[in-house]
Amino acid sequence: MSNALVPQEVSRRRTFAIISHPDAGKTTITEKVLLFGNALQRAGTVKGKKSGQHAKSDWMEMEKERGISVTTSVMQFPYSDCLVNLLDTPGHEDFSEDTYRTLTAVDSCLMVIDAAKGVEARTIKLMEVTRLRDTPIITFMNKLDRDTRDPIDLLDEVESVLNIKCAPITWPIGMGKEFKGVYHLLRDETILYSTGQGHTIQEKRVIKGLDNPELDTAIGDYAEELRDMLDLVKGASHEFNHEEFIAGELTPVFFGTAMGNFGVDHMLDGLVDWAPSPQGRETDQGKVEAKDEKFSGFVFKIQANMDPKHRDRIAFCRIVSGKYQKGMKMHQSRIGKDVRISDALTFLAGDRELLEEAYAGDIIGLHNHGSIQIGDTFTSGDKFRFAGIPNFAPELFKRIRLRDPLKQKQLLKGLIQLSEEGAVQVFRPLQNNDLIVGAVGVLQFDVVVARLKGEYNVDAMYEHINVATARWIYGKDERKVDEFRRKAEANLALDGGDNLTYIAPTMVNLSLAQERYPEIEFHQTREH
């Protein structure tokens, strides 16, 4: 099996995710990115539930009903000379750990900001996660066809709130009904706005040079205003610096309107030109480089029942190095077994195709009958494990109860499977038979009840429970941990992976426990 093409194939790949606050236009951007990459003939604009046309990237039943992205979809499309892997993340009001984990599987991120609102809470939270790995960030200021905030104010806010330098690449001319287009600072050209709706990409009129009299004819008084503004912008903002971008210290900023199919291509050009090709990763045996010939990858997400007809579960595996070939043998590090994979999948949001080959940077789907977990490492050469993917302590908790007590076994099976997939976390207290469900976002609770009913035929409901937070318990001295387990049993539980967890009714209770047991470590994250 010749792997001579590995370096060439790896260098043309770009793997990124989109991060944004709900309703900043992330799903629309996803559609338009696919449209410009020719993956969609008709980009499905997300409207209310009555519209029969659903966005390509929102494909689970619940998403179709609500018009929101609940699960992470993976889409691959060609653009320019590159092959782009886009990982779509839950973007609605309540998201889940899936979003965090997806950010560990990409090499760069596109941050979408609603130019009328600026930096919002969810964006701040997601940026914190990208900082764990200093991920390079490209920024798209969206919705310029509506009335927006002053562009300079927006850049100032990104710099001060998110602590990252901004380098404007395009600059808007007007806004709302008076939106005329953008000036591209690096190309010294003005691209005039003509709206394209749905799947039509309008021919763009481009005027070269800022002093070109054609510009005055085309946009009137806005031309002189633009020249004055650009003098100010060039003096007050940062120039694009590729090294700072790769280090996650500076973000190139593009302006446009995804709904109007305008500006998305400029941002995509920046992505393929500047974003890093697939990067290597640390393992317990040192670093693996993407262009190494031997295959390796890790599982960052498990999706149950992607196809209701098949009742299956798919493990999403990010290839870190080398090449996957149909029928190849891999070593699954956690269980120490060799497995032969002949039916890996590639995706366009729910449309699955069997895969002949894939390279570092690609995301492949592995059929999972319960033997694969989040964080699992697969290798074809040396045996090693990638540094784990974090589990984040839930922020919300409820007790789950059955309407039919005879279904306890099915309930536990469903909850354990959904927790392995990352839909929620489940905790079983040591002292009683309660089942506590923990989540990062409120909607996860609804998702779990709906899926328990639809996929496991279990009718469940929630009750309030007095829990403020959870912490995973570690200790170097096993005797001390055993002693702690006896003394604090009333507050202890096992999570879905049988890890000891402290369930705190209040933050004060947690502080007191930490003071009382200084030799015990209370962790907010746990590696898979």
UniProtKB/Swiss-Prot annotation:
GO molecular function annotations of the record: GTP binding; GTPase activity; guanosine tetraphosphate binding; translation release factor activity, codon nonspecific; translation release factor activity, codon specific
GO cellular component terms, semicolon-separated: cytosol
Keyword Nucleotide-binding: yes
Originating organism: Pseudoalteromonas atlantica (strain T6c / ATCC BAA-1087)
Highest taxon of the lineage: Bacteria
Pfam family membership, one: EF-G_D2
Assigned keywords, A-Z: Cytoplasm, GTP-binding, Nucleotide-binding, Protein biosynthesis
UniProt similarity note: Belongs to the TRAFAC class translation factor GTPase superfamily. Classic translation factor GTPase family. PrfC subfamily.
Gene name of the record: prfC
Function: Increases the formation of ribosomal termination complexes and stimulates activities of RF-1 and RF-2. It binds guanine nucleotides and has strong preference for UGA stop codons. It may interact directly with the ribosome. The stimulation of RF-1 and RF-2 is significantly reduced by GTP and GDP, but not by GMP.
Name this polypeptide is given: Peptide chain release factor 3
Gene3D superfamilies given in the database record: P-loop containing nucleotide triphosphate hydrolases, Peptide chain release factor 3, domain III
Annotated positions binding GTP: 20-27, 88-92, 142-145
Annotated ranges, domain tr-type G: 11-279
